[in-house]
Design a protein with these regions (language model features):
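N-terminal glycine-rich phosphate-binding loop for ADP-containing cofactors
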Residues: 1-231
Length: 231
């Protein structure tokens, strides 16, 4: 998600969305930490994320999304060159500045102008998961970043993990997601995701295909059981 989000975020910026709006979309509306995408990079460190991306590029097979999106866009590469890694260097995508009277201002590093500017507050018209299916630029961003991540996860069983629970727990415990990908899809409604993918002419990821071919509507049932990769 972090790498896909960075590239899809760039596309959104090119279409007119602000970085603050990208952060607002890629946060609590889709069940992710309230920090948002860019602030999460600042927290982890751009230098750390760049190393992870290079590791993806070296070790993942051709065609894997981690390999495709692992390299930073040009503006973020420039930030690395400038030593602009995030909170630990005093600023990455954002920073706090101090005025003479002791008050503080938050500034955003504008990826288009590559200059610092005052941070602005953004309020979304849709502030929940339904944004995934909205035709607005914000909805397109949510679907292309988060929806793509959900579909990517649906292809990882059984190649990376033996079951869907392992992936869900990894994302909830390791990355503070409110729900892992499969629990999230259950909340959204797998049939809605399947319908959207089909309307776009896309092939269903493995676990969504297994679900569609089964007699079940969700990945989990009310007995604490989950769909296996064999159905």
């Amino acid at each position: 998600f972090m790498f896909i989000g960075l590239h899809k975020g760039k596309e959104a910026l090119d279409k007119g969305l602000s970085q603050e709006r990208v952060d607002a979309v890629l946060s609590t509306p889709i069940g992710l930490p309230s920090t948002g995408l860019y602030s999460l990079y600042d927290l982890i460190g751009l230098d750390v994320m760049e190393m992870i991306g290079k590791n993806f590029a070296s070790n993942l097979p051709d065609g894997d999304l981690g390999k495709e999106y692992g390299e930073f866009p040009e503006a973020e590469k420039g930030m690395i060159v400038n030593g602009q890694f995030g909170r630990k260097t005093g600023g990455g995508f954002s920073r706090m500045t101090k005025n003479e009277d002791g008050s503080r201002n938050k500034e955003t590093f504008d990826l288009l102008s590559r200059n610092w500017r005052p941070t602005k507050e953004e309020v979304l018209d849709i502030n929940d998961i339904s944004i995934l299916f909205d035709d607005s630029p914000e909805g397109v961003l949510a679907w292309e970043a988060y929806g793509t991540t959900l579909c990517y996860a649906a292809n990882l069983v059984p190649t990376i993990a033996d079951d869907i629970v392992s992936i869900d727990r990894a994302m909830q415990w390791g990355f503070n997601w409110s729900n892992g990908p499969f629990k999230a899809m259950d909340e959204i409604g797998p049939s809605k995701i399947i319908e959207k993918l089909k309307s776009e002419g896309k092939e269903l990821p493995h676990m969504l295909k297994i679900l569609e071919e089964s007699s079940y509507e969700n990945f989990y049932n009310n007995k604490g059981q989950q769909l296996s990769h064999s159905g």
